């Protein structure tokens, strides 16, 4: 699997209402991944508008900060 980039979870923006983390994509849209997917061990965020993917770099304990939001 080929990634556009590897992004630290701290650099992503959390939308508490939707439970997703986003990161700007070069196409103008945003890479997205659900917090629940991260909890399940998924680490690939995809852009819904193009074929690019990023790998989210995180430790499981990093997810706790988003549950407190």
Swiss-Prot record:
PROSITE patterns to which the protein is assigned, alphabetical: DPH_MB
Reaction(s) the record says it catalyses: [3Fe-4S](1+)-[protein] + Fe(2+)-[Dph3] = [3Fe-4S](0)-[protein] + Fe(3+)-[Dph3]; 2 [3Fe-4S](0)-[protein] + 2 Fe(2+)-[Dph3] + NADH = 2 [4Fe-4S](1+)-[protein] + 2 [Dph3] + NAD(+) + H(+)
Species for this entry: Yarrowia lipolytica (strain CLIB 122 / E 150)
Pathway this chain belongs to: Protein modification; peptidyl-diphthamide biosynthesis
InterPro entries: DPH3/4-like (IPR044248), DPH_MB_dom (IPR007872), DPH_MB_sf (IPR036671)
Gene that encodes the chain: DPH3
Family: Belongs to the DPH3 family.
Assembly: Component of the 2-(3-amino-3-carboxypropyl)histidine synthase complex composed of DPH1, DPH2, DPH3 and a NADH-dependent reductase, predominantly CBR1.
Signal peptide: none
Protein's UniProt name: Diphthamide biosynthesis protein 3
Cofactors (names): Fe(2+)
Superkingdom per UniProt: Eukaryota
């Amino acid at each position: 699997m080929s990634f556009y980039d590897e992004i630290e979870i701290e650099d992503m923006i959390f939308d508490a209402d939707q439970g997703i983390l986003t990161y700007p994509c070069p196409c103008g849209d945003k890479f997205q991944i659900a917090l629940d997917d991260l909890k399940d061990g998924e680490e690939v965020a995809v852009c819904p508008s193009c074929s690019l993917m990023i790998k989210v770099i995180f430790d499981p304990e990093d997810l706790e900060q988003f549950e407190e939001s």
